[in-house]
Amino acid sequence: MRLTWEVETILSTNAEDVALSRLPSTTCTGEQFIARTIEQVWAKAKPELWFIYFKRDACGATIKRDDYGKSTEFGWEIDHIVPVSKGGTDELENLQPLHWENNRHKGEDFPDWTCKKRR
């Protein structure tokens, strides 16, 4: 299930403008990530002891596999470590799972950003 957002379409070749018009957890071009990429990014999360469906993001926040793309207690998104607006790519090395609140809080901040939600 996809989050519903109203986004103003920006027709520009400027990378920063394109990045700002993207929905959270989308590719550099604003497309949804394919299932294989979602699974590969999920595999990068830190295991949660005793639970196979829950893991932890880079901030230590608990995320749930089935809550991908949801704004729930354990919802998560795919984050571009180096933001698209700063030259980040869709390469797996530049992607990480983040609790949706941490991803929104991080925004375009890089390299200095802080976690909003922890354990």
Model-derived segments and their meaning:
Residues 20-31:
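Short, compositionally biased leader-like segments
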Residues 61-98, 106-111, 117:
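Histidine-centered nuclease catalytic patch
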Residues 13-21, 40, 46, 103-119:
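Catalytic cores of phosphodiester-bond-cleaving enzymes
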Residues 2-17, 22, 42-47, 51, ...:
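Mixed-charge, low-complexity interaction segments
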Residues 1, 21, 55, 64, ...:
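Short, intrinsically disordered low-complexity segments
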Residues 31-76, 99:
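Short cysteine-rich loop/turn motifs with clustered Cys
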